[in-house]
């Protein structure tokens, strides 16, 4: 599986992403040709140059707005952006990623300006440079065949910037909204400047599956995109491209644990159900012996890091616990796909796991087996065996 890791130690912006992708080998001619599908080629020019930031070489991509738009941003409503991208000849994958980024950006700007998303039509969402940066980044990721994006935490920066709405404190409101939307971990690197732009934040929030350390991977390429400012640190966004180790996938999970010895077991069962409904990946209990020999249970919840606050709130609300331990761990997953087979009882999904490209496990989806068994009034094991047989016949056929 091809992975892209956004290294945002000095920040992230749309033009920095574009520069890093070009530095990774995305052909400029290919990028320009793909961007022509938007029908805005007469509105901008894309200039690329090799520069240095604090002695580090990087590629700087600059979108120059041409003609009547050079004095300001092109105002387009969110619906126009949707139509422009959806109606283009770009691939479905590029369209989906581009629209996801613009949707996050529009939602953030709408919240900042207290207006419906449909009415958003100001500088960020309508600007030609944002279109080129966002769609161009998605084109580049597609060319590199990136299947999964992860990101480092974001630096908060500081100071003030001038905008159409006057001077704004850094980070600007739209970036803060995007960070809140994506539960992005942030830190201070001591630099007083705008380090994360709304476009850069939207790209990370929409495309990255999680924020944290670089995952285990075999590094194939590292692209460096230069920011426009000269800073006390190298103003460079680094894009790591590589293959997940052994075809496996490693991700960060949060683990919550608490011991309980004074709660109705029926409430514990209900709490487990609610935690799963809230987005926890797994919830289980173990019998333990607590102080003074009292029998109790250890409740363990495994969830995405961004679900920790909601899961903690639910545990405090529904149980008698006075404290919850939480920590992060890495888990390794096999590459998994779902395939569908035809049985005498209807369609059943098969969950297939691969290790180093070799199938190591294939199991019928039990819920499908139950549904087909109830529909045809046969034992669930009969449907399960029929699905396994259909899968084996496909492999041998």
UniProtKB/Swiss-Prot annotation:
Disulfide partners: none
Keyword Transferase: no
InterPro entries: Ni_insertion
Record flagged with keyword Ribosomal protein: no
Signal peptide (from-to): none
Top-rank lineage group of the source organism: Bacteria
Alphabetical keyword list: Nickel
UniProt-listed Pfam families: Ni_insertion (PF01969)
GO molecular function: lyase activity; nickel cation binding
Protein family per UniProt: Belongs to the LarC family.
Name under which the protein is recorded: Putative nickel insertion protein
């Amino acid at each position: 599986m091809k992975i892209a890791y956004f290294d945002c130690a000095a920040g992230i912006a749309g033009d920095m992403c574009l520069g890093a992708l070009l530095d990774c080998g995305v052909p400029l001619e290919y990028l320009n040709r793909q961007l022509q599908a938007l029908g805005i080629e007469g509105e901008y020019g894309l200039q690329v140059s090799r520069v240095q930031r604090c002695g580090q070489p990087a590629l700087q991509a600059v979108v120059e707005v041409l003609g009547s738009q050079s004095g300001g941003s092109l105002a387009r409503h969110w619906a126009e952006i949707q139509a422009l991208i959806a109606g283009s000849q770009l691939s479905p994958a590029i369209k989906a990623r581009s629209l996801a980024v613009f949707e996050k950006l529009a939602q953030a700007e709408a919240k900042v300006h207290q207006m419906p998303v449909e009415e958003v039509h100001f500088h960020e969402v309508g600007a030609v440079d944002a279109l080129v940066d966002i769609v161009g980044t998605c084109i580049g990721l597609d060319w590199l065949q990136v299947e999964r994006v992860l990101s480092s935490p974001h630096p908060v920066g500081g100071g003030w910037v001038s905008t159409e709405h006057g001077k704004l404190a850094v980070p600007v409101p739209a970036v803060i909204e995007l960070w809140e939307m994506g539960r992005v971990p942030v830190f201070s690197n001591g630099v007083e400047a705008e380090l994360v732009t709304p476009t850069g934040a939207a790209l990370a929030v929409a495309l990255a599956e999680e924020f944290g350390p670089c995952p285990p991977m075999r590094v194939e390429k590292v692209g460096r995109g230069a920011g426009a400012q000269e800073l006390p640190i190298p103003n460079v966004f680094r894009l790591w491209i590589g293959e997940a180790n052994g075809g496996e996938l490693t991700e960060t999970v949060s683990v919550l644990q608490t011991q309980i010895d004074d709660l109705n077991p029926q409430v514990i069962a209900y709490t487990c159900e609610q935690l799963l409904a809230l987005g926890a990946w797994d919830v289980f209990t173990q019998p333990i012996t607590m102080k003074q020999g009292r029998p109790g249970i250890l409740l363990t919840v495994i969830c995405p890091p961004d679900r920790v606050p909601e899961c903690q709130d639910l545990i405090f609300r529904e149980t008698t616990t006075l404290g919850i331990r939480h920590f992060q761990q890495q888990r390794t997953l096999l590459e998994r796909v779902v395939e569908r087979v035809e049985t005498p009882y209807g369609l059943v999904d098969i969950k297939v796991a691969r290790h180093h490209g070799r199938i190591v496990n294939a199991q019928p989806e039990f819920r499908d087996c139950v549904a087909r068994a109830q529909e045809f009034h046969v034992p669930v094991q009969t449907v399960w065996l029929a699905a396994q047989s259909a899968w084996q016949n496909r492999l041998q056929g």
